Regions:
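His/Asp/Glu-rich, glycine-adjacent segments
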Residues: 79-196, 325
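Active-site neighborhoods of enzymes that stabilize oxyanions during catalysis
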Residues: 262-372
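Acidic/histidine-rich catalytic neighborhood
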Residues: 228-229, 235-273
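A long, amphipathic alpha-helix that forms part
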Residues: 158-173, 188-229, 373
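Short, structured active-site-proximal loop/turn typified by the sulfatase FGly-forming signature C/S-X-P-X-R
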Residues: 40-84
């Protein structure tokens, strides 16, 4: 009898392990690039407002620097840039001399730059299915693997926003639906850069993605899947106004023999390996209004920007609304500043069967998103920097 019982248990375990995940709740994580936390206060966003009143809302404090690639990879891994390796949109690899750049397909797709474990790999490692649309880093073979469904951002034309939404609905309707769907949308960042955060074009972009999201959710509900989907909406950073009169030129203050390379203008990583070079730079910039400069060892701890070897020997950080560059500039929107500047903070909304209703979380670190999504998926997170931040919101945000 005991032997028969044990055989039945073994068979049951095998059956459960091979059973498709049809009926399991799916988490859909959507990112709207450059969606400032307070855009819903200025523009007409009825769906995000509905999510706020019937779900969980808050604002995300980005990780430093408040740039697209570093923060999307933070959202995906729960690690700050100093720990996950993507320390800026462009930087130097000290070991090889190679320059990582979003415009360089060779380095952008080099997995050696990407540390930590992104959500799609954490989910796959624990037996879940994943589909990812253009999320930064998802087209890179990190640890030799990519999501089950992925799209190469370098291949043009990209899927339109409507096509991405159509695909999400289609995948949710499959019997073997993905357990995790992640989708990246370039707006309102593109409009914010071109026209500024208060421009009518940016307003239209904000309202358009809200309408897109409303349509997506309506289709999910019409298909009878509303009770099976947890929807989480995030952004990587906010946006503030810049005008060329606020440009600070490095050439006005720095001699070329003081550094090997300047990477970025907001912030600027200065590669100056000799101590005398570093001291010369910091001294020359000490009295310049509207910027701060530190040797790497002196970067303020709250920025969490010291651990990675590829961080510059000197960091130059302009005040909000200023740039440190010699190149051409134009009126428009910018980001990359201290993450505690209000205009840099980003939108957060979440609702679904596993999330509470009518909850305001206030400001929260964006490192909490990774462990939050892992919890919604019922999987164990990899090592990350967001556990403490997640514990602060867990009881408020989650049903269980």
């Amino acid at each position: 009898m005991l032997k028969r019982t044990l055989l039945c248990l073994v068979a049951l375990v095998a059956l459960l392990a091979s059973t498709p995940s049809y009926g399991r709740k799916t988490t859909v994580l959507v990112s709207f690039d450059g969606f400032r936390w307070d855009y819903p206060s200025y523009y007409d966003t009825p769906f995000l407002d509905r999510m706020a009143s019937h779900g969980v809302e808050g604002s995300l404090i980005p990780s430093f620097p408040s740039k697209t690639f570093p923060n999307h990879y933070t959202l995906a891994t729960g690690l700050r840039p100093e720990h996950h390796g993507i320390i800026a949109n462009s930087f130097l690899d000290r070991a090889t001399g190679a320059k990582f750049s979003l415009g360089n397909p060779k380095t952008k797709s080099d997995p050696s730059f990407y540390h930590g474990e992104p959500l799609w790999l954490t989910a796959q490692r624990q037996g879940l299915r994943t589909a990812v649309f253009y999320w930064p880093g998802s087209d890179v073979a990190i640890s030799g693997k990519r999501p089950d469904v992925w799209h190469d951002y370098g291949e043009k034309p990209h899927m339109t926003f409507a096509q991405r939404a159509d695909s999400i609905v289609a995948y949710l309707g499959k019997k073997a639906a993905p357990d995790l769907i992640m989708a990246y949308f370039e707006e309102p960042d593109a409009s914010g850069h071109s026209f500024g955060p208060q421009a009518k074009e940016t307003r239209r972009a904000v309202e358009a993605v809200d309408s897109l999201l409303a349509s997506l959710w309506a289709r999910i509900e019409r298909a009878g899947m509303g009770g099976k989907v947890n929807l989480v909406v995030v952004s990587d950073h906010g946006m503030t106004w810049f005008t060329p009169s606020r440009k600070i030129k490095p050439s006005d203050y720095l001699r070329k023999e003081w550094y090997d390379a300047l990477e970025g203008n907001l912030p600027c990583n200065v590669y100056a390996p000799e101590r005398w070079q570093q001291d010369s730079i910091v001294k020359a910039l000490a009295g310049v209004p509207h910027l701060r400069a530190w040797r790497k060892a002196d970067i303020p701890r709250y920025l969490h920007y010291q651990a990675d070897a590829n961080i510059g020997d000197v960091l130059v950080l302009p005040d909000e609304g200023y740039l440190f560059c010699d190149g051409d500039t134009y009126d428009g929107g910018v980001h990359g500043y201290d993450p505690y500047c209000g205009d840099m903070q980003a939108v957060f909304r979440a609702w679904g069967p596993d999330l509470r209703q009518g909850v305001s979380l206030g400001k929260m670190s964006n490192t909490a998103v990774y462990p939050l999504v892992c919890h919604l998926l019922g999987i164990k997170p990899a090592a990350n920097d967001g556990e403490e931040a997640f514990e602060e919101i867990k009881g408020k945000a989650l049903v269980k």
